[in-house]
Amino acid sequence: TNGFKIMKRIQVLLLFIVISCSMFAQDRLSLFIGRANKYAAVELSDYRKRLCVEYNISNQLLDDYYRRCGSNWGNVGLALEIAKTSGRHMREVCDYYKRYHRNGWNRILVEIGNKTRVDVL
């Protein structure tokens, strides 16, 4: 019974850690979405530079993501942030986008395994 109590405490601790990590990722994604309008207000060249610097990617990769994300810079920004917060490779996020974009970003997030709701205008 003593071993059972220890196992139960370890399970509760692990659950707490998982929930905490998930909440941090959701907060980061929510912050990005909140900044989306601010990003959209800048010139395209500045936006591209910000994405390259913030996500440490080259212009060539950025152009590839643009083509793979429906030729929409807003989608590229969201996909980059989702990749960063979910720990997925951007290639995977683009594949999910290609498969589920008709159903919106919420469906893409569900398929990736992120429970954050995205309200995109």
Whereabouts are the PLM-identified features?
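Secretory N-termini
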Residues: 10, 23-26
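General marker for long, soluble alpha-helical cores
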Residues: 26-121
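Short, Lys/Arg-enriched N-terminal segments with co-localized hydrophobic residues
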Residues: 1-6
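Sec-dependent signal peptide recognition
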Residues: 8-15
